[in-house]
Amino acid sequence: MENKKTIYFLCTGNSCRSQMAEAWGKQYLGDKWNVYSAGIEAHGVNPNAIKAMNEVNIDITNQTSDMIDINILNNADLVVTLCSHADSVCPSTPPHVNRVHWGFDDPAGKEWSEFQRVRDEIRERIKRFSEIGE
């Protein structure tokens, strides 16, 4: 019997930040949470996001870039927006769905070191959530 909660990471294109968050979420929260990610649009998984996660031995090549699924959104226990655009244009969530904003810079189109920095910041934030629940 599965009593896992559902966490849903959202950003604009489901390309970089939410993909990395989904991967870290599965690593740190997978025992207790079903972990999903999506975007306002689906831009495809950024090759540098794949490369950044490979650098820490996490393979996200099988993750897909998806638009927001209203069923997952409406049934999630926690929705986490990762960029201000997703926070402002995300469809409304029902009152029983806890929604929080964890803002991270968009590394797309920037230096490689930005992908590494954002990857590590997302890891630390999700690790903290796994340890203290906030």
UniProtKB/Swiss-Prot annotation:
Active site as annotated: 11, 83, 90
Compartment(s): Cytoplasm
GO BP term, pick one: response to arsenic-containing substance
Keywords: Arsenical resistance, Cytoplasm, Disulfide bond, Oxidoreductase, Redox-active center
MF terms (GO), sorted A to Z: arsenate reductase (thioredoxin) activity; protein tyrosine phosphatase activity
Cited InterPro entries: Arsenate_reductase_ArsC, Ptyr_pPase, Ptyr_pPase_sf
Cellular component GO terms, alphabetical: cytoplasm
Major location (coarse): cytoplasm
Catalytic activity: arsenate + [thioredoxin]-dithiol + H(+) = arsenite + [thioredoxin]-disulfide + H2O
Disulfide partners: 11-83, 83-90
Oxidoreductase keyword on record: yes
EC numbers for this chain: 1.20.4.4
Pfam short name (any one): LMWPc
Keyword Isomerase included in the entry's annotation: no
Protein role: Catalyzes the reduction of arsenate [As(V)] to arsenite [As(III)].
Family designation: Belongs to the low molecular weight phosphotyrosine protein phosphatase family. Thioredoxin-coupled ArsC subfamily.
PANTHER family: ARSENATE REDUCTASE (PTHR43428:SF1)
Protein name: Arsenate reductase
Biological source species: Bacillus cereus (strain 03BB102)
Lineage of producing organism: Bacteria, Bacillati, Bacillota, Bacilli, Bacillales
